[in-house]
Design a protein with these regions (language model features):
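Bacterial N-terminal signal peptides that target proteins for export
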Residues: 7-39
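Sec/Tat signal peptide C-region and signal peptidase I cleavage site
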Residues: 49-55
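Flexible, processing/modification-adjacent segments and terminal tails
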Residues: 55-63, 72, 91, 134-199, ...
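A short, polar/proline- and glycine-enriched secondary-structure boundary/capping micro-motif
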Residues: 90, 122-126, 135, 143-146, ...
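Gly/Pro-enriched, hydrophobic low-complexity segments
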Residues: 57-58, 82-84, 132-133, 142, ...
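N-terminal mature ectodomain segment of secretory-pathway/periplasmic proteins
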Residues: 58-140, 221
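Bacterial N-terminal signal peptides
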Residues: 37-48
């Protein structure tokens, strides 16, 4: 294992780190609205660090670019995921809402996603022409014509429908240029282990959110964990997605990218889905 290969100097920047509570999540605009709609409420332990060395910043960017290039080169990808959305109640109690699911991608224009949590059982399919979102337990669905690529779909969901795909930024054709231009601070934090996989641990800061990513070391540098923490709303809300059972190419099971709507399901508009959203209505902020 390479846990000892990282320079001990990288840890000098965090040896005096103090735990602090950041201001937590707000609904963000533009590129981060995708995540804001997923992350909506709170809790995260923020970490204050000393400035990283330039060499560490360059190394972090190189590792992130290698992951971005690797992801872009994969025509077929599938993985399972576990996600946790932290919320804060009006009484200040912090609660985590856990979900699990699957994601199957066929570039440039197909996605099949499932997600099951305590409040929702959702299936989502995009075939390059139409996007269908089915709430199985609520027996409702949305179907919209959205022709184009995965990149165009993510933008459309973000800007028009405010409906995110898990790890949406990581599905884009150029992850590096989705995130890096917004980063005001970049760090290589050394090694970490996620589900037995040794990873490079990177941290980025933008004007509105803090990002952490753990990237598998070796010839398949896929994202093992992705964490988003807000700086702007009291309570430091955090959204975490853990990736497992990563497969590419011929390992990926065949998928029709077709989602038949069951008889009796009610058609809704994209703005009328409180029962199948990741954040259930009982936790929605009061107006």
């Amino acid at each position: 294992m390479a846990l000892l290969k990282k320079s001990p100097n990288r840890w000098h920047a965090i040896k005096n780190a103090e735990e602090r509570m950041s201001d937590a999540i707000k609904m963000l605009s533009g590129r981060w609205k995708t995540w804001a709609s997923v992350v909506a409420l709170t809790t995260a332990a923020g970490v204050t660090m000393m400035p990283a060395a330039h060499a560490d910043e360059a190394a972090a960017k190189a590792l992130f670019k290698a992951m971005s290039d690797y992801l872009a080169a994969q025509k077929a990808i599938s993985f399972d995921f576990d996600s946790n959305l932290e919320v804060v109640t009006t009484e200040g109690q912090k609660i985590g809402l856990a979900s699990s699911g699957t994601l199957n991608v066929n570039r440039p224009d197909k996605i099949h996603m499932t997600r099951t949590g305590g409040f929702a059982d959702v299936e989502f399919v995009f075939d390059g022409k139409t996007v269908t979102l089915l709430g199985k337990n609520a027996k409702v669905y949305v179907q919209e014509e959205v022709p184009g690529t995965i990149d165009q779909l993510v933008d459309e969901l973000r800007n028009k429908f405010q409906r995110p795909v898990p790890a949406a930024d990581l599905l884009m054709s150029d992850v590096y240029n989705q995130i890096m231009p917004l980063a005001t601070n970049t760090k290589d934090l050394g090694s970490g282990v996620i589900r037995g996989v040794e990873c490079d641990h990177l941290a980025f800061r933008t004007e509105e959110v803090d990002l952490q990513i753990w990237i598998a070391q070796g010839s398949n540098p896929y994202p093992c964990r992705y964490v988003i923490t807000s700086q702007k709303v009291a309570g430091s809300p955090q959204y975490t997605i853990d990736v497992r059972s990563w497969k590419t190419g011929a390992e990926v099971a065949a998928d029709r990218f077709n989602l038949p709507v069951p008889a009796g399901a009610k058609k809704l508009t994209a703005n009328d889905l409180p029962d199948i959203d990741e954040l259930p209505a009982i936790f929605a902020a009061k107006k």
